[in-house]
Design a protein with these regions (language model features):
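Acidic/histidine-rich alpha-helical segments that form the ligand environment
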Residues: 86-121, 132-141
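Positively charged, low-complexity intrinsically disordered regions
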Residues: 27, 79-81, 89, 108
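Bulky hydrophobic/aromatic packing residues
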Residues: 11, 26, 63, 84-85, ...
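Amphipathic alpha-helical packing segments from all-alpha helical-bundle domains
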Residues: 25-32, 102
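Short, contiguous alpha-helical
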Residues: 4-5, 15, 19-23, 30, ...
Length: 158
């Protein structure tokens, strides 16, 4: 067996690393948000600002739109404004299940991309290549994970 057949290619490693990082961030968000009461999950401790629940809706919508809908052709139709203004939020089990499903969609879509597809332009030109867009989406998730951590401290008054 040649060395190349027993080692991951750079493309495989990049795809794996992106998905693993996103899954770790998702797990961190769940760890922060799951212990909260519904009131804490949906309260807005900073005005103007977002609730933790609304940020989770936003992360879910972002992944479903840019990765699921645009790259995976899932047919997802985004309502970004609703992500931040939902007045009748979903039950917590549904909120977390939808986040899990969005991250699973990313894994499925990314696993199916070839090197040529990763290097191709993303449907939204502002992102550059598909690979660069995927890096952006992971960074975006990380940014909001940090905000969620801060909001948990505020709602828990820690």
């Amino acid at each position: 067996m040649s060395a190349s057949s027993t080692q991951k290619t750079l493309t495989q490693e990049a795809k794996s690393a992106l998905c693993e990082e996103l899954e770790q961030l998702r797990d961190a968000v769940r760890q922060l948000a799951e212990p909260l009461t519904d009131r804490e999950l949906w309260s807005k401790p900073v005005d103007p600002g977002n609730s933790i629940g609304h940020l989770i809706l936003h992360l879910t919508g972002n992944l479903n739109h840019f990765v699921g809908g645009q790259l995976g052709k899932t047919g997802y139709v985004r309502d970004r404004e609703r992500e931040f203004a939902e007045s009748r939020p979903p039950a917590r089990a549904e909120l977390f299940a939808n986040l899990d499903a969005a991250v699973a969609t990313v894994r499925r879509v990314v696993d199916g991309l070839s090197e040529a597809q990763l290097l191709a332009p993303h449907p939204e030109a502002k992102f550059g290549s598909v690979y660069k867009a995927l890096m952006h989406f992971v960074a975006h998730f990380a940014l909001h994970r940090g905000q969620i951590s801060y909001l948990v401290r505020l709602v828990k008054k820690v």
